[in-house]
């Protein structure tokens, strides 16, 4: 391993806030981005399949996890969710550690960890700074219901499991307002990258 450790910028935001779009803007600016959700998708097609099949019979087919079947097993069952997290979280952490080591080896000055449930899992300690992507509640709702399969019940359940946006904003080092269009959000990302050049590290 060579090079200094990169500045770790953690990106988070509630359902429908535009976090994925903000992540793309960081990537456009040349920043390596680690997408936790994408890692989980990969695990559900490979490394995690056997363990999930054993813990949740009937949730896999064709060598892959059926996400909708798995969701029905865990959405209202905290014990089942804890079992799933015990399988998935260590594998996600391993992938994240490899990403950080690779970034350090390439002497990347800054990286982004895209972690949807950053505050919910108490992950702030792995960050030098936290970026929260936010938008008004009515816009959040509209975006969320553009997703396939979204229902009132599912929306309410997902929101109930997330730290409220107001609290996320309060705990953020930076906020990206995604309500004013792509160009405005992209400019905010550039401003953040300039600002962190002079920020002390927290880790």
Kindly label every feature range from the protein language model.
Residues 49-53, 137-142, 152, 156:
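An amphipathic alpha-helix signature
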Residues 125-126, 146, 150-203:
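Small-molecule kinase domains that catalyze NTP-dependent phosphoryl transfer to phosphate-bearing small molecules
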Residues 1-66, 194-203:
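Glycine-rich phosphate-binding loop of ATP-dependent small-molecule kinases
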Residues 32, 38, 129, 173-174:
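Well-ordered beta-strand positions
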Residues 84, 112, 176:
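Residue-level signature of catalytic and energy-coupling elements of molecular machines
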Residues 8, 31-33, 109-110, 124, ...:
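Hydrophobic "anchor" residues on beta-strands that sit immediately upstream
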């Amino acid at each position: 391993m060579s090079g200094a450790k990169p500045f770790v910028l953690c990106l988070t935001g509630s359902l429908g806030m535009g976090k994925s779009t903000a992540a793309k803007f960081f990537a456009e600016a040349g920043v390596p981005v680690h997408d936790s959700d994408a890692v989980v998708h990969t695990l559900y097609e490979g490394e995690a399949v056997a363990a999930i099949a054993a813990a949740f019979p009937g949730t896999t087919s064709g060598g892959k996890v059926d996400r909708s079947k798995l969701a029905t097993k865990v959405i209202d069952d905290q014990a089942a969710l804890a079992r799933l997290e015990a399988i998935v979280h260590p594998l996600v952490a391993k992938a994240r550690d490899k990403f950080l080591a690779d970034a350090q080896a390439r002497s990347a000055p800054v990286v982004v960890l895209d972690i949807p449930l950053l505050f919910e899992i108490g992950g702030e300690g792995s960050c030098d700074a936290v970026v929260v992507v936010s938008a008004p509640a009515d816009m959040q709702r509209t975006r969320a219901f553009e997703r396939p399969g979204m229902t009132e019940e599912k929306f309410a359940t997902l929101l109930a499991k997330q730290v409220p946006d107001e609290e996320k904003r309060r705990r953020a080092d930076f906020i990206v307002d995604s309500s004013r269009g792509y160009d405005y959000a992209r400019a905010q990302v550039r401003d953040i990258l300039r600002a962190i050049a002079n920020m002390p590290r927290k880790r």
